[in-house]
């Protein structure tokens, strides 16, 4: 199977991208904000939904990178962003517009943790590694 490469430039695109990363496992140390580049990136082990296996079957996981451009701010809630052994289960990614194309991207994790990115506009890329 070919590797997945997706880009999200609006809320509908992001819904598709979010579905592909649902139940992904993310290590806290594998998340980083490059302030000078206005980019937030994270590595994950995502469930390979395209393999056609159901939830109850032992599925495959793929290593993937997700990054957001035009990031102006980053805020976390419900987890320690400096935890060297922290592991999070990604549930969903949503976008809430605020002013024009600007808005908030929210990554929701199991257990109530959230990561909020203030962005100039929505631009996200998911790439299997």
Q: What residues fall within each predicted segment?
A:
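Surface-exposed, interaction-prone regions used to assemble/regulate multi-protein complexes
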Residues: 1-129
């Amino acid at each position: 199977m070919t590797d997945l490469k997706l880009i999200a430039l609006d809320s509908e695109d992001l819904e598709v991208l979010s579905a592909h990363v649902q139940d992904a496992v993310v290590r806290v140390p594998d998340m980083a904000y490059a302030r000078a580049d206005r980019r937030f990136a994270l590595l994950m082990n995502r469930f390979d939904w395209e393999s056609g296996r159901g939830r109850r079957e032992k599925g495959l996981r793929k290593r993937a990178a997700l990054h957001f451009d035009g990031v102006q701010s980053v805020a976390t809630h419900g987890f320690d962003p400096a935890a060297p052994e922290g592991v999070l289960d990604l549930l969903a990614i949503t976008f809430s517009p605020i002013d024009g194309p600007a808005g908030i991207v929210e990554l929701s994790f199991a257990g109530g943790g959230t990561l909020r990115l203030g962005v100039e506009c929505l631009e996200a890329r998911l790439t299997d590694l």
